[in-house]
Amino acid sequence: MESYNAVTWLLDRNVEEGRGGKLAYTDTVSELTYRDLQKQSCRAANMLRRLGVRREERVAMIMLDTVDFPIVFLGAIRAGIVPVPLNTLLTTDQYAYVLADCRARVLFVSELLFPAVKDIVGRMPDLDCVVVSGKNAYGHKLLSEELARESDSFATIATHADEPAFWLYSSGSTGMPKGVRHLHSNLAATADTYAKQVLGIREDDVCLSAAKLFFAYGLGNALTFPMSVGATTILNSERPTPALMFALMNKYDPTIFYGVPTLFVAMLNDESLKHERGGKRLRVCTSAGEALPESVGLAWKARFGVDILDGVGTTELLHIFLSNAPGDIKYGTAGRPVPGYQVRLINENGGEVADGEVGEMLVHAPSAGEGYWNQRSKSRSTFEGYWTRTGDKYVRDADGRYTFCGRSDDMFKVSGIWVSPFEVESALITHPAVLEAAVVPEADPEGLLKPKAFVVLRPETKREGLDEALKDYVKQKIGVWKYPRWIEVVESLPKTATGKIQRFKLREGAHH
């Protein structure tokens, strides 16, 4: 078997091809050239070896987006060790569950995030040591000191393309997160498809991702894609607020901005930022995580003169497999399959559905993980061999474009017809009074399901007569049976750490 280590392709190739002096990362405090990153990742590999971690064992990362993240992530993979980046917004109980589940030997944690794990690190049976990124080690090891002790050369482990390289835990919008095992070959698979053939990523690009590196989306945006061509990435360790995103755009002038729908909405709607223009070199924006409403895409294009390429990806498939493309955009749809991916829509019996009919999406993906860790039945029902089940329902139009209808468990039938919560929400947020909306099924007095809407109103909105106005508005936009029978005004909507609406929480509250 021919050996293949993802770091040789992602990092060392850039140095060998003459880009060693090029800026790979800046996190507003530190900068790393590709050569710096190569040396530091070798130090990290040597450190892990010294700490007694063996090939294929796991090391967990609860790390903010600073230059230390790629150093640790790539250093582990270089040593044949499996890094497991974790969501930085989990609870202490969730961290205890995941650290036990992945049996991490070492935990790398940012100084600011250490309080979330301080009470549990002593009782994790497999955890040998904690390494803190920052200035205060809290009595544990300090990453900067540990790296400084090591040599900056390391004989990269001759792993294989089909060997586990890293794990990502799915965001668990329903239940506890599941560890998805990704292979060395999966990283290049996303770069050769979406990055190369949809984004057209280039060496002179400067990338800014609102999504953090621990997300599959963020990892591609800010590590795999830029490093695949020797581009530069701006890392931001803070929460991506509209003001901060515009400040980073003004300072670094990125060419690619990767966002999510809730952030695009907030950036468009912040009155104090109406003068912002998003930098001079911006050539393309991307959106994923949840479907981008048509009204948002059109408003963004009108103001900034740049398209948002809306696409769909999952943790299991590592990055975007359905996307709009430059020169081929239809806002309100997820576009077409990314070159290199195949998709099909099936009904409850496994048969193909016709254009215009709702079906569950299956994907054949070169970037699919090999399964979940310690979850055999869930692995078998998701990773079915050639096809991977997404658990999402879509409809395909005559032009071969796909429109998201909802998670399979978010969809519901009204009068025997499927209703997509997303379609009703998209209609509601085009109304001038509505900032955000979420729709769930609610039983009427006869026990039949009908749509119920939770809405966040714009400031200064008058409530009088609004419920009826919104109902009539939706009827006119998308059809009589889809309008929300009940409307509840709320201050905010429950969301995951990724900004996805947690409809199941609203559903639990709706069924009185």
In which residue ranges do the predicted regions lie?
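Conserved AMP-binding/adenylate-forming core of the ANL superfamily
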Residues: 21-66, 70-74, 91-96, 144-145
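Gly/Ser/Thr-rich phosphate-binding loop
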Residues: 231, 254-259, 269-330, 342
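AMP-binding/adenylate-forming catalytic core of the ANL superfamily
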Residues: 90, 107-109, 257, 365, ...
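Conserved AMP-binding/adenylation subdomain of ANL enzymes
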Residues: 188-206, 216-256, 270
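ATP-dependent adenylate-forming carboxylate-activation enzymes
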Residues: 63-64, 81-97, 111-117, 231-252, ...
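Conserved pre-ATP/AMP-binding loop-to-beta segment of ANL
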Residues: 21, 149-169, 176, 200-206
